Amino acid sequence: MLPILLSFEGKKVAVFGCGSVGKRRAKKILKSGGIVDIYSKEFDEEIKKLKESNKNLNLIEIDINQLSDEELKNIIMKYDFIVTAINDEINKRIVKLAKELNKFVNSSTKTEGVNFIIPAYTEVDEVIFSIYTKGKSPLIAKHIRIFVENYLKSTDINMIAYIREFLKETIPKQKDREKILKKIFENEKFREELKKLIEKWENGNH
C-alpha cells in the first residue's frame, strides 16, 4: 500500500455498523467533507445527536444479517467508499462484495482484501502525521501518535514556515536555505529569540 492524503469532499460513503469503530471512522470521514450513510440495527443517543447537527450524516436502520448478497450489492454499488465495522464474518462478506464491484473498502477486522485504510493520525497547525501498524498494534499506533502530537505542539511550525518564506525571497539556493533552517531548528535558544522578534514585528505592524 502507498500512504496518501485524500479529501472526502462530496464523496458518498457507506458505513456498516455503528459500534465504537464505526462511529469513529464515520466522524473522521464527515470531518473531511464526506456524505456518510450508516447502516445498523440500532443507534445510540450520541450518533443521533450528531445526525441532528450534521446534514451529511444519514442513519439507516437495518439488519445486515437479513440481507441477501444481491441486496447488499444494490446498497454497496451506490457508494464511492465502503467501511464495514460489524464482526469478522459480516466484514469478510462485505469486503468480498465490495471488491467485486471495484469499490474502495475498509474493514475493522480484516486487512486482506481491503484497499484503503483510515490510520491513526494527528493534525497540528498545518502538519498532518499518520501511523499504521497493519492492524498488528493499534495501541502502539496510538502512543506514537500522541508522542508526535506533543512534539509538534512544542515546535512552532508557523515560525519555521515564516522563516522559510523569508529565506526564499533572500537566498536563491535551496541547499543554502536548508542549511540555515536546520541550524535554526536545532538551536532552541536562537529559535526563542527569533520568535520574540517576529512577534514584536507583527505587533508593530497591526
Swiss-Prot record:
Root EC class? oxidoreductase
Q: What is catalysed by this protein?
A: precorrin-2 + NAD(+) = sirohydrochlorin + NADH + 2 H(+)
Asked if NAD is a keyword of the record, the answer is: yes
Keyword terms: NAD, Oxidoreductase, Porphyrin biosynthesis
InterPro entries, sorted: Met8-like, NAD(P)-bd_dom_sf, Sirohaem_synthase_N
Q: Which GO terms describe its biological process?
A: siroheme biosynthetic process
Pathway listed for it is:
Porphyrin-containing compound metabolism; siroheme biosynthesis; sirohydrochlorin from precorrin-2: step 1/1
Which Pfam family name is an example for this entry?
NAD_binding_7
Transmembrane spans: none
Provide any one GO MF term from the record. Answer: ferrochelatase activity
The record's family statement is:
Belongs to the precorrin-2 dehydrogenase / sirohydrochlorin ferrochelatase family.
The UniProt function text for this chain reads: Involved in the archaeal biosynthesis of heme. Catalyzes the oxiation of precorrin-2 into sirohydroclorin.
Q: Matching NCBIfam families, A to Z?
A: cysG_Nterm
Quaternary structure (record): Homodimer.
Q: Which PANTHER family match?
A: SIROHEME BIOSYNTHESIS PROTEIN MET8 (PTHR35330:SF1)
Protein name, per record: Putative precorrin-2 dehydrogenase
